[in-house]
Amino acid sequence: MSYLEDFEKTLAEKCHQNEPPFCQAACPFRLDIKGLEEKWKKGRFNAAYRTYQNTVGFPDIVSKLCSHPCEKACLRAKLDGGIAMGLLERATVEYAKRKAPNAYNLPSKGKRIAIVGGGLSGLGCALRLCNKKYEVTVYEREMVLGGQARNQMDPAEFDAEIEAQFQFEKFSCHLGETVTDLEALRADYDAVYVATGADGVDFGLEMDPDGAFATRTPGVFIGGSLTGGDSMKALADGLAVSLAIERYLKTGGMNEPFRKEGTLLKLQTNGIERADRVVPANGESYTEEEAMQEIARCQKCSCDACMRACDLMRLHEKTPRRLYEEVYITIHPGTLSRDGTWATRLISTCDHCGLCKEVCPQHIDFSQFLLDSMRAMPKKRRDAVAIPRFLAA
């Protein structure tokens, strides 16, 4: 296969442009911090809160209990201090005016799910399934919901947040009831999630390596602190397992893809100007202005070495993947009803210096791709022309 024909596969397998930034990769919720950055820097705390809420489920609880591993993973951590995500998240919760969750007017799905354990993991799973109108029943051995997390903050504030996020949802709750017979539970429900906590019973379940949170028992899933991790990882598991349960209820399959771990980004602090971390004037929390000043330190980490080094890519202000799409349309005009001349100028402008390959961490040769594209144009009945650099702009 020629380099031209194989280039799409090369981009998919090697290009790091779409790799998550270090902070997002370290976050148990995979929070879209770059998306939040766009909202924070404009002072759009309502929009930021909605993104935060949709990702973590219980914003007030997470902002107070999360250890924020993203701060240590931040590119600036070893330079002048990582972005203060903890303070920014708490500022989001404090300054957002519209906090009510979305109310979904959906018909009942007619499927029943049992959740064994009323800690954060079980509550997170219940919230997501209730949002989609599944019938959920939570079994909790204690007389209150929340598990260990409830004791890590003011219980009144914890309960208030749970009530706020469930204000438009309904689920059954059996407090003070210990489940001892899992098979009896399976007979009454379409799916079961076991989230009994760090010291909880696992009912002898075996994990299934072919699906996230799946066990070898059909319809039974397991996660949360029972399988390791702190309360934030447990909550993230609960939110994610709801997708695995829904897949099972719809298809009968227990093969939900595993969440991608880590990032392939490789960036250095060379050339980054120092900007000391913003310290709250009151010593505790940011004002809106302080929050906007702090997020301005964000580097919006992404692999853009080729775009920074190549005059051609800077001229067209497009990512390698977008450029590939436009070149493909040009040399395969039948893919669109239009005349397919989108990238003729782009193809003809490159002088094939090879700089893009030199600076790319994966040594992807975009210039060779454009050269092969130019050679392919006559075969596709497209004329390629040479455009000198001084005429390219």
Predicted regions and their residues:
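Ferredoxin-type iron-sulfur electron-transfer modules and their immediate structural context
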Residues: 1-107, 112, 164, 189-353, ...
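Beta1-alpha1 glycine-rich phosphate/pyrophosphate-binding loop at the start
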Residues: 30-42, 47-50, 82-86, 115-178
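Short secondary-structure capping/turn micro-motifs that flank functional sites
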Residues: 68, 145-146, 180-182, 326
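Solvent-exposed, well-ordered amphipathic alpha-helical segments
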Residues: 135-143, 186, 190, 289
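Short secondary-structure transition/capping segments
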Residues: 149-151, 185-187, 371
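A structured beta-alpha segment of the ubiquitous adenosine-cofactor-binding alpha/beta core
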Residues: 167-188, 287-290
